[in-house]
């Protein structure tokens, strides 16, 4: 029994040792194959020798083909994001991948490898274009977690150099139609020191592309598209090839509609409420008028905070100013009405009383003594004295006339198409004139103000949105 157990133990131990040896052999083979695929030692040596040979007599201070022909730079730009756009500072922010391709015959090499992909450590060892962004205020390259730069060298000497940049570029906004304005914000770049005789920039086919706009921070703008141009700019240092990308932006009106337009319209409508308040309610109408004027002043100040201090009138300035004039005119309407209402003619009761109970000492200078029966009274049948005047079959006593009556009869106020009293309406001097009753000014205003404001809005919105 014991020899059998010993034999079984020896058999199991032998099988275990053999299987372990097979696993180790397979692991060594796989690891050696993986190492050979990723970075063969012979290829590492080959690349190192190629780079050392290329840079041995290379002068990075000299551009390719110097003294022979201009260096041609092919440009590609991938727009990662745009925004935000600042109307106050007249600038916008853009995040791009900027790629430049050129040929340097000094970097040709013979090898089984057609492309050498290198990191940013190689950038400072070869010549690269001195490209600048002409309208940039600030610009920075990305360095996290490593410098965002790529360098590729083909065996025929072609070089691709890309880097990621965030640029705050200047954009001169024309705000005449603000907030219904559209803009073309440029990104301008060129060589800093090489004129067109030494360096030429070219756009490649489909050279400008844009990423998904969902991550863009445009906020108040819609991206309408882009276009690129090439031009020659003449300076005192020479003629330079200048490349420009225009980003077409259209402003969204939602924010300004809620913030400015709707409050202004409601304030103007609120000022019309005074036309339906009794004209003798002076405190109520005055308080309403002053409140709406102060509200419009506040709204105009707030509207200007989102704009730079431009010297011309914008579309929003025009709208706010007209709304302010409507509100101010509503207040002045009541001031006019209140002034002429205070010059009101004496009431009918007072006139009737004056006629029925006149002061005999004023209009009957003396009594006539005649003999008459006791059941009869004697009356003076002479014409009325000069102190009494007649106008439109109505009798007025001159001593009861106030200043307004005198001015109206004199034609001083009536020549301006306004009447103090209804009797001014039919005088001989009124022939061919339009009668406007100043006491009915509220009735006229209830129609005139809404109609004129509606016409203004019609012209304003059609003119700025469709013309």
UniProtKB/Swiss-Prot annotation:
Keyword Lipoprotein tagged: yes
Tissue note: Expressed in brain.
SUPFAM superfamilies xrefs: Neurotransmitter-gated ion-channel transmembrane pore, Nicotinic receptor ligand binding domain-like
Record note on quaternary structure: Heteropentamer, formed by a combination of alpha (GABRA1-6), beta (GABRB1-3), gamma (GABRG1-3), delta (GABRD), epsilon (GABRE), rho (GABRR1-3), pi (GABRP) and theta (GABRQ) chains, each subunit exhibiting distinct physiological and pharmacological properties.
Alphabetical list of Gene3D superfamilies matching this protein: Neurotransmitter-gated ion-channel ligand-binding domain, Neurotransmitter-gated ion-channel transmembrane domain
Cytoplasmic side: 278-283, 333-446
InterPro entries in UniProt: GABAA/Glycine_rcpt, GABBAg3_rcpt, GABRG-1/4, Neur_chan_lig-bd, Neur_chan_lig-bd_sf, Neur_channel, Neuro-gated_channel_TM_sf, Neuro_actylchol_rec
Signal peptide limits: 1-17
Catalytic activity: chloride(in) = chloride(out)
Record key words, sorted: Cell membrane, Chloride, Chloride channel, Disulfide bond, Glycoprotein, Ion channel, Ion transport, Lipoprotein, Membrane, Palmitate, Postsynaptic cell membrane, Signal, Synapse, Transmembrane, Transmembrane helix, Transport
PTM comment, free text: May be palmitoylated.
PROSITE patterns associated with the record: NEUROTR_ION_CHANNEL (PS00236)
Protein known as: Gamma-aminobutyric acid receptor subunit gamma-3
Keyword Disulfide bond among UniProt keywords: yes
Annotated organism of origin: Homo sapiens
Residues modified by glycosylation: 110, 228
UniProt topology in membrane: Multi-pass membrane protein
Cystines in this chain: 171-185
């Amino acid at each position: 029994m014991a020899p059998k157990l010993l034999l079984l133990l020896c058999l199991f131990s032998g099988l275990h040792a053999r299987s372990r040896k097979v696993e180790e052999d397979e692991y060594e083979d796989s690891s050696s194959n993986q190492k050979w695929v990723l970075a063969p030692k012979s290829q590492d040596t080959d690349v190192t020798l190629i780079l050392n040979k290329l840079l041995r007599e290379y002068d990075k201070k000299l551009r390719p083909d110097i003294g022979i022909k201009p260096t041609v730079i092919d440009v590609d730009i991938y727009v990662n994001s745009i925004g935000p756009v600042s109307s106050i500072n007249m600038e916008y922010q853009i995040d791009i991948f900027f790629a430049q391709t050129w040929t340097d015959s000094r970097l040709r090499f013979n090898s089984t490898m057609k492309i050498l992909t290198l990191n940013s450590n190689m950038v400072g060892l070869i010549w690269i274009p001195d490209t600048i962004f002409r309208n940039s205020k600030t610009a920075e390259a990305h360095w996290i977690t490593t410098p965002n730069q790529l360098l590729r060298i083909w065996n025929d000497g072609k070089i691709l150099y890309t880097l990621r940049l965030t640029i705050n570029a200047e954009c001169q906004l024309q705000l005449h139609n603000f907030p219904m304005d559209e803009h073309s914000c440029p990104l301008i770049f060129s060589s800093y020191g090489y004129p067109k005789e030494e360096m030429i920039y070219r756009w490649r086919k489909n050279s400008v592309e844009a990423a998904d706009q969902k991550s863009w921070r445009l906020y108040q703008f819609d991206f309408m598209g882009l276009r690129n141009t090439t031009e020659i700019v003449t300076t005192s240092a020479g003629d330079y090839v200048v490349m420009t990308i225009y980003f077409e932006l259209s402003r969204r009106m939602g924010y300004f509609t809620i913030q400015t337009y709707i409050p202004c319209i409601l304030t103007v409508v609120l000022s019309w409420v005074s036309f339906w308040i009794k004209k003798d309610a002076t405190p109520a109408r005055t308080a309403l008028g002053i409140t709406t004027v102060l509200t419009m002043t506040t709204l105009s100040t707030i509207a200007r905070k989102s704009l730079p201090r431009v010297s011309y009138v914008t579309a929003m300035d025009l709208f706010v100013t007209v709304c302010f004039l409507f509100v101010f005119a509503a207040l002045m309407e009541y001031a006019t009405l209140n002034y002429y209402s205070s010059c009101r003619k004496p009431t009918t009761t007072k006139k009737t009383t004056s006629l029925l109970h006149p002061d005999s000492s004023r209009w009957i200078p003396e009594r006539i003594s005649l003999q008459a029966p006791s059941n009869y009274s004697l009356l003076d049948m002479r014409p009325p004295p000069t102190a009494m005047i007649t106008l439109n079959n109505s009798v007025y006593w001159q001593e009861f006339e106030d200043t307004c009556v005198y001015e109206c009869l004199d034609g001083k106020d009536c020549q301006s198409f306004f009447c103090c009293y209804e009797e001014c309406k039919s005088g001989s001097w009124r022939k061919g004139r339009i009668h406007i009753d100043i006491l009915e000014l509220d009735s006229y205003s209830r129609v005139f103000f809404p109609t004129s404001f509606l016409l203004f809005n019609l012209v304003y919105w059609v003119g700025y949105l469709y013309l």
